[in-house]
Amino acid sequence: MVKSKIYIDKIYWERVQLFVEGHSENLDLEDSNFVLRNLTETRTMKANDVKIDGNQFVCRFNVAILDNGYYLPEDKYLLVNEQELDYIAQLNPDVINDAYQNLKPEQEEEYNELETQNGKINFLLQTYLKEFRKGGISKKTVYTVTPEISSDVNEFVLDVVVTTPEVKSIYIVRKYKELRKYFRKQSFNTRQFIFKAIFNTTKFFHLKKGNTVLFTSDSRPTMSGNFEYIYNEMLRQNLDKKYDIHTVFKANITDRRGIIDKFRLPYLLGKADYIFVDDFHPLIYTVRFRRSQEVIQVWHAVGAFKTVGFSRTGKKGGPFIDSLNHRSYTKAYVSSETDIPFYAEAFGIKEKNVVPTGVPRTDVLFDEAYATQIKQEMEDELPIIKGKKVILFAPTFRGSGHGTAHYPFFKIDFERLARYCEKNNAVVLFKMHPFVKNRLNIADKHKQYFVDVSDFREVNDILFITDLLISDYSSLIYEYAVFKKPMIFYAFDLEDYITTRDFYEPYESFVPGKIVQSFDALMDALDNEDYEGEKVIPFLDKHFKYQDGRSSERLVRNLFGS
């Protein structure tokens, strides 16, 4: 198949005018538009002028007025050629080669010390960086446009950064802000004092071991996930007749707790003999539990994939080595012995306190009766899958967190994927991470092949009807391995992701399937059924000590001696 591409051959500035010259391959540029588009697809800025000469183009962007008469806002922008299909402009390797040839000896030494290929390219692209300083000299008010290869999408972008000094507020406003900050701090300290007072008082009156169980989460609104399976197993073993079981949940760590729960939580934490948590839970790290209390971490994810907790000490977002986070746990339950050192490291606890009973919420994956039932239910809800090969596309998000989370859908050639589906009697279900802000837009002509199931219920239910999983860095691969079916890992930004996020084991030798770093390679793997599926069963055996659907039972018996 002949591939159509857009290449950037030259970048230069004339005052506030950015010029981008380039050429196309196997693509007619007439009647097309050149735009700058941000990664979350919420901003599109049309070029002020475009000159086309055959397959050559010159785009002019006036950054001072590009946003409807205002300056180009702070963001990262792709250069996109808009036609019936969109084409993302790539950097011509000659641009990089020319920049390298012009390096000075001291620059070349600095260049050679860089670890990643994109890091080296971005070092060379500094040549094309443009700064506008207020008055020509300001260090505080600066508008910067930096050409670079984005670590989020592994594509050429223009990174626009606007730096301004903190605005000096008038005296009364400044005083108001200072007072508000003071009272917020006092309010926080008061709440902490009350919380600890209730906890310590309750703890004092419950020094002897009793029969109270608490399930609590700051990121779960109801009894679900591992909690649900543990709770149901306790009911099955009639432990609800022996223990008083309580719950305190809230949907998100940033949500405010209800007035009653503000008092219930410290009271129950001080009283409970068994406290279940399944994620980061800040308040429990601020108090000291009595020795007879069990604080049990049943982490929401299976296995040890991306680093968390103390495994990220010294990195952005990681706790410092003296932090009390996580250290309260008296037990953590995991899926296999392989996970023990990683979870002990992450939580800052002793390895002997990490117990490989299996992960409760995976029990359903081994339930044949449930499998039969859910397959029928899924076919009723998604009739498009009947008699089809079902491919689940379930990547993680890109961006630094909840506020910037997105997925670069332009990394998918939907036309080509649709042709594959037509030829192979297949459908693709897209399950995006809940954080992803930009929605998947499926063209009408593709709706017979693609379905967005991002808002669908439990993702594990979708696994029962999936024939092939395409993912990248999602821990969903552990659950899917149970089905002993193939996976492909579309990791187009692998080098940068490894550098910034870290894994417990080398990604290339760890994942149970074929790794591809371009869409062409992904389609080749699909066309040739080249999945490296032989990796799945060894992966399953390594990470699931038990494959019998009885993890909940083992955990409950281990903890309660039932």
UniProtKB/Swiss-Prot annotation:
The keyword RNA-binding does not apply. GO terms for molecular function: CDP-glycerol glycerophosphotransferase activity; CDP-ribitol ribitolphosphotransferase activity. Disulfide bonds: none annotated. The keyword Chloroplast does not apply. It catalyses: 4-O-[di(2R)-glycerylphospho]-N-acetyl-beta-D-mannosaminyl-(1->4)-N-acetyl-alpha-D-glucosaminyl di-trans,octa-cis-undecaprenyl diphosphate + n CDP-L-ribitol = 4-O-[(D-ribitylphospho)(n)-di{(2R)-glycerylphospho}]-N-acetyl-beta-D-mannosaminyl-(1->4)-N-acetyl-alpha-D-glucosaminyl di-trans,octa-cis-undecaprenyl diphosphate + n CMP + n H(+). Its EC number is 2.7.8.14. It is found in: Cell membrane. It is a peripheral membrane protein. Signal peptide: none annotated. InterPro entries: Glycerophosphate_synth (IPR007554), TagF_C (IPR043148), TagF_N (IPR043149), TarL (IPR049702), Teichoic_Acid_Biosynth (IPR051612). Pathway: Cell wall biogenesis; poly(ribitol phosphate) teichoic acid biosynthesis. Its main location: membrane. GO terms for biological process: cell wall organization; teichoic acid biosynthetic process. Responsible for the polymerization of the main chain of the major teichoic acid by sequential transfer of ribitol phosphate units from CDP-ribitol to the second glycerol phosphate attached to the disaccharide linkage unit. Synthesizes polymers of more than 40 ribitol phosphate units in length. This is Teichoic acid ribitol-phosphate polymerase TarL. The lineage of its organism: Bacteria, Bacillati, Bacillota, Bacilli, Bacillales. The gene is tarL.
